[in-house]
Amino acid sequence: GLLYLVSIPFIFSYFFSFVLTSLFSYFGSYTMLKISGLALSFVILNMAQITNNPTTHIFGSQFITQGLYLIISFTVIYLLYSFNKKITFIAIIAFMLSGAVISFINNASFNDPNKIRSNEKLQTFLKYKKNEIIYKKNIYVLIFESYANKETLEFYGFNNSEQIDFLEDNNFTIYHGSYSNGARSLSSTSRILELKNQLSKDERHYLNGNALVLDIFKANGYKTVGLFKSPYAFGSSPISWDEYYPKDDVTKIGGKTILKAIYEGYFRFDIFDDNYDNSTYLKLRNNYLSSRDDNPTLFYTHGEHPGHSQNSGVCLKNEKQKYFDGMEKANLQMKNDINVLKKNNPESIIIIAGDHGPYLTKNCTALMRYNQKEINRYDVQDRYGAFLAINWPKDIDVQDYNIQIIQDIFPAILGNITNNKILFNQLKLDRRFLDEFDERVAGVNVKNGVIIGGEDDNKPLFENRSYQLKK
């Protein structure tokens, strides 16, 4: 863990800056070799941070960016070393440790165990008799990573009509044109569970099971289950799901994983999956979907398919084909899930949803370096669009809510399984992008389904949509 994370970089830096320097001092200046070793160690240990955001690469080149960092590091260290050796070493060590210290302080402030989570909103909700759940159906929320809408898929060149037909034949309502108010998995899905526009805690805190929606269902006798492929979604807050997998959080695997990212040169979005066997996750997923429990269950899972781009800032030649292959895998998984649920839990509420878009247009990542006028409808769909389909049991009188974003899932469910039919309007979040839209789509936003800014300013985000546009 922490010891591993600190000791390995120290050994690495010492080896490059002193051991190799001593060995090669016979062939050149000891001082210049030491400075070169320090500069190289500094750049390598900060490589993941340097390359993390492709939009900041100089001239759009990772190679040029890394080279300039090395030259600048060497120059700064040389000047400091010429002035005062002690100051040089203190400055380098302080800079390397400052990131870890700041991260630790921020994490501690988010997760102070002495703080009692405010439950005022929960208590207010539970006091109102009409908010009591009267249709205690099992609820299954199946999140498919970056699963796009039909309109967006057609733009990419992928025909998903067969899957749509399968869903409709199995009593699913397709909410065409749905999108998320967040463009990342954590920001998007945490708000599905917490139902808050501005989150007061780290996003992982809510995915740990500390969320309003889960508390409401627990208070109504539900068992909550959170199933994930890896602990990427779990932060250091207490994990409050009644049952969950894996039994780790993201901090437990930090040392080796972060060092691996450093020496690879960048943070892969799926690097946390490397230590976890997907077959175990899939087996547990199938077991939960096929099991029957005396108590009502709220089951939540987030799978890996179809997946999104590799976020390097340059689209791979086979980027779309990789996504299409992922779509095929996701569709097979979806069919299996639905067949299992229809056989074992036919009266359950089933949600099929994407979390955000796959990032396949322009540079296949964030668009902050683009002029806003260059950002079109499909660029926005590509980052914020998210598929949504819901199977409503036939004995529920489903209200005609204007479902528009994936964060509408639980406001709609609670409005339909309680006697409070206006709960949807009371709980729904803003129909706009809530964070990072300056980075993701160069400041373009969406308000109530209409694009604000960019090439398609004042036009609907989706032409093919199930909801009514409201000003």
Give each language-model segment a name.
Residues 84-111:
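Internal/C-terminal transmembrane anchor helices
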Residues 140-141, 330-370:
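Metal-dependent active-site segment of extracytoplasmic phospho-/sulfohydrolases and closely related
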Residues 110-130:
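Alpha-helical transmembrane signal-anchor/signal-peptide segments
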Residues 105-114, 265-279, 312-327:
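Surface-exposed cleft-lining segments at the edges of enzyme active sites
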Residues 235, 292-332, 359-368:
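Active-site His/acidic residue clusters
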Residues 201-204, 318-327, 338-339, 374-377, ...:
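Active-site rim elements
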Residues 12-39, 46-49, 53-77, 136-141, ...:
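Active-site-proximal alpha/beta segments of enzymes that process anionic O-linked groups
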Residues 1-11:
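Loop-to-helix transition at the N-terminal end of transmembrane alpha-helices
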